[in-house]
Curated annotation (Swiss-Prot):
One of its GO terms (biological process) is box C/D snoRNP assembly. This is RuvB-like 1. The gene is RUVBL1. ATP binds at residues 70-77. Its main location: nucleus. Forms homohexameric rings. Can form a dodecamer with RUVBL2 made of two stacked hexameric rings; however, even though RUVBL1 and RUVBL2 are present in equimolar ratio, the oligomeric status of each hexamer is not known. Oligomerization may regulate binding to nucleic acids and conversely, binding to nucleic acids may affect the dodecameric assembly. Interaction of the complex with DHX34 results in conformational changes of the N-terminus of the RUVBL2 subunits, resulting in loss of nucleotide binding ability and ATP hydrolysis of the complex. The modification N6-acetyllysine is found at residue 453. Ubiquitously expressed with high expression in heart, skeletal muscle and testis. It catalyses: ATP + H2O = ADP + phosphate + H(+). It comes from the Eukaryota. Its EC number is 3.6.4.12.
Length: 456
């Protein structure tokens, strides 16, 4: 007897360095639990982020900036991702790194503006009137051609639609008759017609005719329930950048130039301020009419000290514009020279006039106990068994070196344990691996000792 194991077809996600972060881990009153949702410690920073999430949800935070400042390996990126998780998928979250703005094709400010627009969502509500049912009759009515001659033109189309509740006869425009012909609609088909645009969609043949033929390449659909005339509310989520791109490069065009343009490699073009202004006007009109609502999202700029003085000056204006998202900066620098200047030093590599506009959240170094908890969570995420002794030793290594280094030792130590035929990582495996791989501090120490042997 042969038994086959059926493998799951669901996508296996690669474990990234922040896969374990599921949220900020706050209770109902907004206080941080010691360890929850994959985050450990940093209670003050997490509570501050919780307040920001509440402000974003109540739409009172637009155009403000927050700076996550702290030493490397204290969880700044993890906090930003936790904010994104808390906000959910409906609020746009656009992550970028400070060095992304340097491009040979377009200006630095253009890259910043593009990401600003990516972080602002627009929720468009549309009520569509739809006629839906099975076609019972389809009669085009002809009249004499007004241009003279013997030809005849179609003046209107009479169509009968039937649902489970009743039937309706509609008198339609001749332009819809062309759509009906394109869709090859005939009696017995289930169709729907949009009242606003006159678009016709054939859904399939009604399943009462399913027994008519043995061989047929038709898709049979049930008779629609409810009335023939229905109202459907459709909600679409788009970002302002999507609207910019759609209008910057219009599709179509039958002439040879536009055909060539589509075939050639599209060069990244800049979207002009004029076009953005026009789109803003249309968006504002929609908001005034109540068709759409603006959803200010989050723009996360990691390694913000990589931006130069021109970008920072541009950020002043962008943050104070009428349509601006919430901007979260992250930096692990202390006092350093602002990029693009000769000798101006500033905290976190950000000019003082911009620092004045941001709210700063500090992240502190982890205690050995918190390091152990984080390593334990990482081991669970990666599906690794680890003994208590090995965990304590990794915690000590993390305190002496960095958290990242001790987390990186997990996978090689697990491999070594498997080679030795053990199920879980023991202390000796961790010791052996830490001797094989150097951390940054010990590597720098060796460099200092043997400086004369290396090339200058």
């Amino acid at each position: 007897m042969k038994i086959e194991e059926v493998k799951s077809t669901t996508k296996t996600q690669r474990i990234a360095s922040h896969s374990h972060v599921k949220g900020l881990g706050l209770d109902e009153s907004g206080l941080a639990k010691q360890a929850a949702s994959g985050l450990v410690g940093q209670e003050n920073a997490r509570e501050a982020c919780g307040v920001i999430v509440e402000l974003i949800k109540s739409k009172k935070m637009a155009g403000r900036a927050v700076l996550l400042a702290g030493p490397p390996g204290t969880g700044k990126t993890a906090l930003a991702l936790a904010i994104a998780q808390e906000l959910g998928s409906k609020v746009p979250f656009c992550p970028m790194v400070g060095s992304e703005v340097y491009s040979t094709e377009i200006k630095k400010t253009e890259v910043l503006m593009e990401n600003f627009r990516r972080a602002i969502g627009l929720r468009i509500k549309e009520t569509k009137e739809v006629y839906e049912g099975e076609v019972t009759e389809l009669t085009p009515c002809e009249t004499e051609n007004p241009m003279g001659g013997y030809g005849k033109t179609i003046s209107h189309v009479i169509i009968g639609l039937k649902t489970a509740k009743g039937t309706k006869q509609l008198k339609l425009d001749p332009s819809i008759f062309e759509s009906l012909q394109k869709e090859r609609v005939e009696a017995g088909d289930v169709i729907y017609i949009e009242a606003n645009s006159g678009a016709v969609k054939r859904q399939g043949r009604c399943d009462t005719y399913a027994t008519e033929f043995d061989l047929e390449a038709e898709e049979y659909v049930p008779l629609p329930k409810g009335d023939v005339h229905k109202k459907k509310e459709i909600i679409q989520d788009v970002t302002l950048h999507d609207l910019d791109v759609a209008n910057a490069r219009p599709q179509g065009g039958q002439d040879i130039l536009s055909m060539m343009g589509q075939l050639m490699k599209p060069k990244k073009t800049e979207i002009t301020d004029k076009l953005r202004g026009e789109i803003n006007k249309v968006v504002n009109k929609y908001i005034d009419q109540g068709i759409a609502e603006l959803v200010p999202g989050v723009l996360f700029v990691d390694e913000v000290h990589m931006l130069d003085i021109e970008c920072f000056t541009y950020l002043h204006r962008a943050l104070e514009s009428s349509i601006a998202p919430i901007v979260i900066f992250a930096s692990n620098r202390g006092n350093c020279v602002i990029r693009g200047t000769e000798d101006i030093t500033s905290p976190h590599g950000i000019p003082l006039d911009l620092l004045d506009r941001v709210m700063i959240i500090r992240t502190m170094l982890y205690t050995p106990q918190e390091m152990k908890q984080i390593i334990k969570i990482r081991a669970q995420t990666e599906g690794i068994n680890i003994s208590e002794e090995a965990l304590n030793h990794l915690g000590e290594i993390g305190t002496k070196t960095t958290l990242r280094y001790s987390v990186q030792l997990l996978t090689p130590a697990n491999l070594l344990a498997k080679i030795n035929g053990k199920d879980s990582i023991e202390k000796e495996h961790v010791e052996e691996i830490s001797e094989l791989f150097y951390d940054a501090k010990s590597s720098a120490k060796i460099l200092a000792d043997q400086q004369d042997k290396y090339m200058k």
